């Protein structure tokens, strides 16, 4: 099976992690980001995880998020209060991960525009089934990944 899918389950590796992302953001913005991020994988000064493999996976996803928006976004982001930063980080996540975008558009917005504003696990599972029916890569995910 060729990996031509726009989807990834990588979001599950580090979820939202607002505080951790903010702690690492200066490293991402640095001119020597590669060196600093490698040091963070080894020392884990900001990421409180047990091993280098987990730290590496999280930092890989943080880098993807960081690169998904223009550089001047991060200047604006730094000027925001915490609540606005969390909303801005949600925007970055929606922009980075197509599955999260689809959940937002096909589940959250649909619920927002309906009488029932509650999003259930079943709502998300139904959307994932729809995606899975049309994407061989997503369909190949284990049941554990799909949870």
Predicted features and spans:
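DNA-recognition alpha helix
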Residues: 120-134
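Short, positively charged loop/turn segments that connect secondary-structure elements
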Residues: 130-146
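Short amphipathic alpha-helical interaction segments
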Residues: 50-54, 142-147
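Positively charged, polyanion-binding regions of nucleic-acid-associated proteins
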Residues: 87-91, 95-118
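Conserved phosphate/pyrophosphate-binding and hydrolysis machinery centered on Walker-type P-loop NTPases
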Residues: 14, 94, 143
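Amphipathic alpha-helical interaction surfaces
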Residues: 65-68, 106, 110, 130-134
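Short, solvent-exposed secondary-structure capping/transition elements
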Residues: 71-74, 112-117, 134-138
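Eukaryotic partner-binding/assembly regions in large regulatory complexes
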Residues: 1-90
């Amino acid at each position: 099976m060729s990996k031509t899918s726009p989807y990834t389950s990588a979001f599950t590796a580090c979820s939202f992690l607002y505080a951790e992302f903010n702690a690492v953001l200066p490293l991402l913005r640095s001119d020597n980001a590669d060196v600093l991020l490698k040091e963070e994988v080894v020392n884990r000064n900001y990421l409180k995880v047990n091993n280098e493999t987990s730290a590496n996976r999280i930092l890989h996803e943080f880098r993807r998020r960081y690169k998904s928006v223009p550089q001047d976004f991060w200047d604006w982001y730094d000027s925001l209060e915490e609540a606005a930063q969390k909303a801005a980080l949600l925007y970055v996540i929606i922009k980075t991960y197509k599955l999260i975008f689809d959940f937002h558009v096909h589940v959250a917005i649909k619920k927002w525009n309906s009488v029932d504003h509650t999003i259930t696990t079943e709502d998300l599972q139904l959307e994932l089934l729809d995606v899975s029916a049309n994407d061989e890569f997503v369909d190949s995910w284990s049941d554990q990944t799909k949870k």
